[in-house]
A protein has these predicted regions:
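Conserved, structured C-terminal
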Residues: 1-244
Length: 244
């Protein structure tokens, strides 16, 4: 067995509802690529691996290419995608989109970022709402016993909040109920497209019920909110997993 460290692999994320329309002009079979699948192909006559993945909650793709090819691919996408509205963006934009789509980001939604006053850091899949990542009853993997032991012992839940108005929750804003802090908002955003003001928050289990009234204590002032299930956008994943 040999191990070779190679940093000559670049990742370009190409996201949006028209991404498949653009790619279908250059990549044969791209419409048949299932959600979370990948294919070895070429783009602009350059070798790439294209995956049906992304971090936006929208239909999208990622291109894994050689470092020397990345600038060419990037420039061609921006230039030839301009008529369809293609523009470059940065991770800050993705950070806002993930709030709508319930895409967690370590450590920013975890106790490593917001440690407990009276408990050790570290979160369970049950607390994060990620227990679906383990097949029910599956055993034999590292941490299996601990995973099942902690079921039903959640100290908190990661859950959504829907705020009033258009002022988004501050990152790290205290989540208040009956005048006491009960949690923290890990990320918030107001969507001018979907016209909702939403956030991901850590809160007590008994508060993680749709309609629970709370208050987000922003630095600029308090904002009323209600607990809301996630994702807020495309909850059935019909857009990101669409066929054809």
């Amino acid at each position: 067995v040999s191990i070779r460290f190679d940093d000559n692999l670049h990742d370009i994320s190409f996201q949006g509802p028209l991404s498949v329309e653009f790619l279908s002009k250059y990549v044969e079979g791209i419409r048949d690529l299932p959600y979370f699948a990948h294919m070895q192909t070429t783009l602009f006559d350059l070798p790439v691996m294209i995956s049906r993945t992304g971090y936006t909650g929208e239909r999208g793709y990622e291109f894994f290419c050689r470092g020397q090819d990345a600038p060419t691919i990037w420039a061609r996408i921006i230039e030839q995608g301009a008529p369809m509205g293609t523009i470059p963006t940065r991770f800050t934009t993705l950070d806002l989109l993930r709030a709508e789509s319930y895409l967690l980001f370590f450590p920013y939604d975890n106790s490593e970022m917001y440690p407990f006053e009276d408990d050790v850091t570290g979160d369970t899949l049950w607390e994060l709402g990620l227990d679906f990542t383990v097949s029910p009853g599956k055993v034999g993997f590292r941490g299996a016993e601990e995973h099942y032991r902690l079921k039903g012992k959640e100290r908190f839940k990661i859950y959504g909040v829907m705020l009033e108005g258009t002022t988004p929750a501050d990152e790290g804003a205290p989540l208040m109920k009956d005048g006491k802090q009960v949690g923290v908002v890990t990320v918030g955003t107001y969507s001018s497209v979907n016209k909702h003001n939403v956030g991901i928050a850590r809160m007590p289990v008994d508060c993680a019920v749709d309609g629970t009234e709370m208050v987000v204590a922003n630095e600029s002032g308090d904002v009323k909110c209600k607990a809301h299930s996630m994702p807020f956008y495309d909850p059935d994943k019909k857009r990101r997993a669409a066929k054809g």
